[in-house]
A protein has these predicted regions:
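C-terminal interaction appendages of subunits in large macromolecular complexes
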Residues: 1-256
Length: 256
């Protein structure tokens, strides 16, 4: 687990085996702190923490001792005044870090450019913050076949391919990913990836060929035409019957 104040915590999943209807306490948070991300690990991963001011620290999770459910955790990263952690990623999630700033700029940087160090440090610069870029809003570990979604403060969403994003060095700003109106910023980012297994496992045995599709469309059009004629004939017959009833009712009124 990681909090915005740079605290990290590692707890065995077995500690959460018996969850009550009202839930279980997962972590004790310090004042003004909040949980930002949770990852399932194997106790062998390198962890990346990235802050809104463009700092990044990489350390191995073995540096984080395992603690109980209600513990606070330990310091993962020392932050400067006003800074906060915006994302936690693991090396197994991707070969690069995609970092996006609030004014719609972003870049990919190889994870290998970040040297592992002991937890609790200030990290290294991972993004050049300027007035043009704004602060960092999110980070995702990605591979070239991944796709990303960006959502703005106005609720606009775009989807981009990681392969179309520029691969840049550690101490650089990004390139334009989305055009934003004045006073609109990127609110959040997410990684999406096509599940090829769904396509591979799809049953295509009942799919029609191109000729069968044309034949089916022709039959459907002919049936629709017949239905239209039948409906017209039925309407004419119904109208004729109603007129006959009206004439009969008029005759009865005259006899009375």
């Amino acid at each position: 687990m990681a909090t915005k104040k740079g605290i990290v915590k590692k707890t065995p999943i077995t500690d959460y085996a018996n969850v009550r209807k009202t839930g279980l306490a997962a972590i004790t948070l310090r004042e003004d702190d909040e949980l930002i991300e949770v990852k399932k690990t194997d106790n062998e991963q390198d962890i990346f923490l990235v802050t809104k001011y463009g700092q990044c620290i990489r350390f191995n999770e073995r540096d984080v001792r395992s603690t109980g459910r209600t513990s606070m955790g330990v310091i993962g990263m020392n932050l400067t005044d006003g800074d906060k952690v915006v994302g936690m990623q693991m090396e197994s999630q991707g070969e690069s870090l995609m970092i996006v700033s609030e004014k719609g700029l972003g870049k990919c940087t190889l994870a290998s450019e970040f040297t592992a160090q002991n937890r609790g440090g200030k990290g290294v610069k991972c993004y050049k913050i300027t007035e043009k870029t704004g602060n960092i809003v999110g980070v995702k570990a990605v591979n070239q076949d991944d796709e990303m979604m960006l959502i703005t403060t106005e609720g606009i969403i775009i989807r981009i391919k990681v392969s179309d994003t520029t691969l840049l060095g550690r101490i650089t700003s990004g390139v334009k990913l989305i055009n934003l109106d004045e006073n609109v910023t990127v609110a959040s980012i997410a990684k999406v990836r096509e599940d090829k297994s769904l396509i591979d496992n799809a049953d295509t045995s009942e799919l029609l060929s191109e000729e069968e599709e044309k034949e089916s469309a022709a039959i459907a059009a002919e049936n629709a035409k017949k239905a239209s004629v039948e409906n017209t004939e039925t309407d004419d017959e119904l109208m004729k019957e109603l007129l006959e009833r009206a004439e009969a009712d008029g005759s009865e009124d005259e006899e009375e």
